[in-house]
Structures are given as structure tokens and as C-alpha cells.
UniProtKB/Swiss-Prot annotation:
The gene is ilvD. Mg(2+) binds at residues 81, 123-124, 491. The lineage of its organism: Bacteria, Pseudomonadati, Pseudomonadota, Alphaproteobacteria, Hyphomicrobiales. It comes from Rhizobium leguminosarum bv. trifolii (strain WSM2304). This is Dihydroxy-acid dehydratase. Functions in the biosynthesis of branched-chain amino acids. Catalyzes the dehydration of (2R,3R)-2,3-dihydroxy-3-methylpentanoate (2,3-dihydroxy-3-methylvalerate) into 2-oxo-3-methylpentanoate (2-oxo-3-methylvalerate) and of (2R)-2,3-dihydroxy-3-methylbutanoate (2,3-dihydroxyisovalerate) into 2-oxo-3-methylbutanoate (2-oxoisovalerate), the penultimate precursor to L-isoleucine and L-valine, respectively. Pathway: Amino-acid biosynthesis; L-isoleucine biosynthesis; L-isoleucine from 2-oxobutanoate: step 3/4; Amino-acid biosynthesis; L-valine biosynthesis; L-valine from pyruvate: step 3/4.
Amino acid sequence: MPAYRSRTTTHGRNMAGARGLWRATGMKDSDFGKPIIAVVNSFTQFVPGHVHLKDLGQLVAREIEAAGGVAKEFNTIAVDDGIAMGHDGMLYSLPSRELIADSVEYMVNAHCADAMVCISNCDKITPGMLMASLRLNIPTVFVSGGPMEAGKVVLHGKTHALDLVDAMVAAADEKISDEDVQTIERSACPTCGSCSGMFTANSMNCLTEALGLSLPGNGSTLATHADRKRLFVEAGHLIVDLARRYYEQDDIKALPRTIASKQAFENAMALDIAMGGSTNTVLHILAAAHEGEIDFTMADIDALSRRVPCLSKVAPAKSDVHMEDVHRAGGIMSILGELDKGGLLNRNCPTVHAETLGDAIDRWDITRTTSETVRNFYRAAPGGIPTQVAFSQEARWDELDTDRQNGVIRSVEHPFSRDGGLAVLKGNLAVDGCIVKTAGVDESILKFSGPARVFESQDASVKAILANEVKAGDVVVIRYEGPKGGPGMQEMLYPTSYLKSKGLGKACALITDGRFSGGTSGLSIGHASPEAANGGTIGLVREGDMIDIDIPNRTISLRVDEAELAARRADQDAKGWHPAEVRKRNVTTALKAYAAFATSADRGAVRDLNAR
């Protein structure tokens, strides 16, 4: 039977000093011997997805103590990618994932916590905590802050559903008046919560359901809705039960590495492909698998992308559909239910809340459940009142969306497309692969060829796009923006948004060794591996080179013969693999430390001590 980790600091005469310190935090004699549960919060006033989390850690803590555990809360950092976007702040976003994982490890191991509840929400916080949970392999439950309500605005007599990306696109569109831009800006983000579309934050919170590490509804229940409180209350009780199962009954099914097995990662990736999740999820899933020593690679993602159809399209792929609409259609359990009906899911994976994922789907899929409680849960609707307060409204939809032929969630027989929402492309331009969110690509440009417009930075590309120097038919290439070359692998949301604002969203392609925001749509191909700084072919592209993209056949090619490429490579080796133009970029010691050990995106941009 495994011993409680916390007894290292709470038992024995030689731990008198440690017990004295524990007592100073409020512990009593009766607490020594109870499981010590770390409540890993990520409250910050910088991020709308986290601004409402301040009191929720203590809500969970009270439930832990009511269930017989001892709760100890600490905080991690949290970067808002939207606020950090478009300037040097974005260099810090992806590296913050590693810092979050490390900080959780440091706190939990330094104080010998037995288990943890991870209160996450936005882009790098859920992945960082997920990496930590698999690294530590102690009982863990995830409960996120929940998605924001979609914005609503009336412009020129028409009602529009809005999100953050709409504000960015409008601001760059010279045809839209200052007054309308301001109206859109003020309406785009009306409440607390993670941005309202199927962007990175919501994608990752949905994937925790498929991995079996969070409760049903974690990915789709609105931050403002009273129903979300139940997830936090249940998480507090559940984690104590999981801790006791592992430490007192030697039940390894309470551990993250048993729950989030390779089969569970396949489920999560199948969900990601079916719902057209953010391309960033590929990075984070690969990184989490690495931490859990799970053999899950780009090859597995490629194989899944060839057989899993696209069953849901949410903003940015479908601008009038947001997470509140996904929830009304049954949320993640109903998407998993459709995959299950199509034989595309591993039903026997354990979860933190049910014996198997299959059992959970049978109870929580609104098309098969007999529970009115479950059906009422998925009727939770937006309140339509701007607020930063969690659980502040109780609105309900009159009816659920159970239309699997034309609704927000489709059946395998009636998909949005037979090909899934994400695809891995390979070719001489990306030998180790690159990623495209096919759910956001117009069918007319699934095959695309054009001349390269080469930029050594995101900033240079933005300047050219806004100056109308990029034309229809061009392939914009942005390089030296990978994990090492950036450093930090910036998101390219501004270039893609500005292409859209110029009417080029369906007329151009963009290829980068950087990455994209979950808010990106269009023919946007990221994570080109190896990255330019690691000698990738993207570093050899020259202005005007023809590039061929074939999504149906999963290829991406630079139309340059091998002899010419070899000559260019020899020339670049002599010069060194760095941008041809000097970039005004403040690369601090912290960023240099990340760059020194960062791998390319095909490995999840994780650190490798042998990378140097």
C-alpha cells in the first residue's frame, strides 16, 4: 500500500519543526494523517478567464475539508494571450506553460501534497497544469473557470454574435467606421470566462473531459452560470475519494497516468479533430504525453485525422456558433457520444468520475440519457448581462439542440466534412510535419499553389499586409518564429486577422514555424518542423518560390529541386540559422534559457536537456 506522501512532513519526532509550521497555517492534531490536497489556483486580475477564480479555490477547499481532507491553496501565473498578442509579450506565452508545470511540481513536491485540484482556464494554464499532473502522477481533478458568454451587438438593424476575433478584424478593416469598431470592441467580451469560441482555452478544457480528468460539462458550461458551481463542489469531494482510493486501497485507476493512457490520448485527439479544436492543442497534447511517458506522436495524430470526421464547427470556423451553443447541443459528452456511435472511441478508459468513459457517455450524452437532471444541466444558457462574477445567472434554453443532421453537433453519418477538423501535412517544406485547422479552411482552397512572400518576423508580415503589399494568390511565409527561433513560438493571429480584413482570407495561404491563436481561420499552416532555427527547410525559402499545398493528400511542398536546396542549405550553414534581417526584439535571459532547450513543434515544443 503506498504511504501518503504528506506523512513525510507530518509524522515522526524529527518532523516536529515541520508540524509546528503546519500548525501555523491552521492545522490541528486531528489533521495530521488526513490527505493534504493542493488546490492549484490560477486567479489573476490580468485575464478575463481567471478574474473570477479568486474565491473558487476556497470554495473547493471547504468541500475538501468537509470530505475529510486538508486543503492548501497556492497560485500559478497566467498569461492572457490576447493582451500579450502583437508585441514582445507574446514571446512569453508558450514558455509560461513550462513555468506553470514547473511551479506546480515545485510546490507539490516541496510540501509533499498527496493530490491536487487544478483550477485552470486559459491558453497555457490548462496545458501547464496537465503536464504537471502527468509528471507528478498523483490523484488530480481538473475544474476550469468556464467559457465566456458570446457578445451580442445590433449593427445597422442586424443582431450579431461576437467574440474577440471580430474586434480584431473590425479594427483592421478600413471600411468599418470608428463608431462601429468601438461598439464591437465594447460588446465582444461581455463576461468573465475564457474567450467564447473554440479557441485554445476552451479546446483544452474540452479535452480534459475526453482524457477523463474532469467532470462532464467542464469544457462547455458557462463561467457565469450557477450550474458551474456544482463542478467545483464535486471536485472537492471527488479528489478526497481519489486520494483515499490510491493511498488506502492501492487503486492505480485513481492516478493520471492510468486514466490518461495512450487510449485516452487517442480519445482526446479524436475529439479535437471532430470539434475542429485549436491547432495549439496538438502542441499541448504532445507535451502532456511526453510528461506522462506516453508514446503518442504526430504519427498518431496523422492517423486519427485521416479517419475522424468533423462533427462540429464553432467560431472561428463558424462565426455564429459559440461554446454556449455547443453546451445546448449536449457539450463534449455528446460529441464523444457521436464518435462512440461511429466506433471511433475507446470506451473502456477510466475517468475520475465514472468507471469508464463509455459509462459516462451513456449517462451524459443527451441523445441517449433518460436523466432529466442531465438534460436540464445542458439547458444552461447565457444570461446576457455583462459581469465578472461566477455563477451569477440561471438562464435556461427552452429546448435542447438534438438535431444531429443539421445542428451544432452532427452525427458521423451527417458530418460537416468527412475529413476531420485538423490535419498533419508533410513534404520537403516540413519534413517532420506541420498542422492546419481544416475546419477553418474554405473548400475552394483545400488545394493551393502560389509564390512565397517571405518574412523574417511576424511584425514584418503585418506591416506588408496592412500596406497592401500581399496580393491574392500569395503564400505568406513567416519564419524564425518557432520555439527556439522566436524564441517562444508566437501566435500569428494579427497576420491572419489582417488578411481577413483585407478580403484575402480565402485568397492567400500563410505558413509559419510559429503557431496560431485558436481564433485563427483560413489556410493557416503552423508548427512547420523542423523550425528555421533548427535547420528546417522553411529557412531556405526565397521570395517568389512556388509552394504547393494539398490538404486532401496531406502534402506541402516547396517547388525547388534537391540540388538547389542542397546549395541553399550549405550557404545557410555557413551563415548560421538566424533571421537575415536584424529584429528589434528584447530577448531576455529568461527567454534565452527557454530557447536553449526548446524542441521543434513536432515534439510539443518541450524542453530537451540534450537539445543544445
